[in-house]
Design a protein with these regions (language model features):
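Enriched for short, Lys/Arg-rich terminal
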Residues: 2, 11, 22, 37-38, ...
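Solvent-exposed, charged helical/coil patches
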Residues: 2-30
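A short, surface-exposed loop/turn module that caps and links secondary-structure elements
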Residues: 27-53
């Protein structure tokens, strides 16, 4: 499965200082790309899904699926910024 990243997602990921968190998030994304395994995820709103990483503050990656073969990573965050991250994800998706 092809996984694409928005500039907003890349900016968020690059700012993560916790190397273990980066590794865990990268591993989750890699499993989607190579094994079509999504792990702990759920729909949140309007075609946007939340991938939950159970580490640290509860990292979240918001994504949408286009067809059966493309996943677009919209933005990331954690449990404390969940609502604002969902709103940002909606805006990013609207502009894609």
């Amino acid at each position: 499965m092809l996984v694409k990243k928005t500039p907003e997602y890349v900016k968020w990921f690059d700012k993560l200082k916790d190397s273990k968190a980066r590794s865990k998030i990268y591993t989750c994304i890699d499993r989607i790309a190579t094994q079509n395994h999504f792990g702990d995820c759920k729909p949140v709103v309007d075609g946007i899904f939340e991938l939950r990483i159970h580490y640290g503050p509860g990292y979240r990656v918001y994504y949408t699926q286009r067809g059966e073969e493309i996943i677009l990573l919209l933005i990331g965050g954690d449990k404390s910024t969940q609502q604002s991250d969902i709103e940002k994800a909606k805006k990013i998706l609207a502009n894609q």
